[in-house]
């Protein structure tokens, strides 16, 4: 049986959070704080290609293969989304992804980008 990495699981949770961010941002356009909705759409659109396993992004994806940095980014970017009702679910999913990234970093896992260079 192959070795299972929690970092890959955290990336999949993060991709689900990106879809929730985009959907919540579209719904949030009709709320009072439109800037949070626009922020969530932009964050979801930028994070999705970085979390998706695309080979041609190469060194750009290296930031998400350092799991401590990925956990801090996911937790930090989710803070503003707690202030608008449609984006709260996405913020919670991003925080779950940050916790899983942190657990995988504590366990000593390394991303695929760094495994290939050894």
Swiss-Prot record:
Protein name, entry field: Superoxide-generating NADPH oxidase light chain subunit
Pfam families named in the record: Cytochrom_B558a
InterPro entries named among the record's database cross-references: Cyt_b558_asu
Source species, domain of life: Eukaryota
Disruption phenotype: Prevents formation of fruiting bodies.
Residue stretches in coiled coil: none
Role played: Critical component of the membrane-bound oxidase of phagocytes that generates superoxide.
Transmembrane segments: 9-29, 36-56, 62-82, 83-103
GO MF annotation: an example: heme binding
Family: Belongs to the p22phox family.
Quaternary data: Composed of a heavy chain and a light chain.
GO term, biological process aspect, one: innate immune response
A cellular component annotation (GO) from this entry: plasma membrane
Entry keywords, A to Z: Cell membrane, Membrane, Transmembrane, Transmembrane helix
Organism: Dictyostelium discoideum
Location(s), subcellular: Cell membrane
């Amino acid at each position: 049986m192959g070795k299972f990495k929690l970092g890959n699981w955290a990336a999949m949770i993060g991709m689900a959070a990106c879809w929730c961010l985009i959907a919540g941002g579209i719904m949030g356009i009709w709320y009072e704080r439109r800037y949070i909705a626009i922020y969530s759409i932009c964050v979801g659109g930028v994070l999705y290609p970085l979390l998706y396993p695309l080979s041609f992004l190469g060194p750009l994806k290296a930031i998400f293969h350092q799991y401590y940095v990925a956990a801090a980014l996911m937790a930090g970017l989710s803070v503003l989304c707690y202030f608008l009702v449609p984006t709260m679910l996405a913020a919670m999913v991003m925080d779950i992804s940050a916790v899983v990234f942190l657990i995988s970093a504590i366990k000593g896992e390394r991303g695929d980008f760094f495994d290939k260079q050894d």
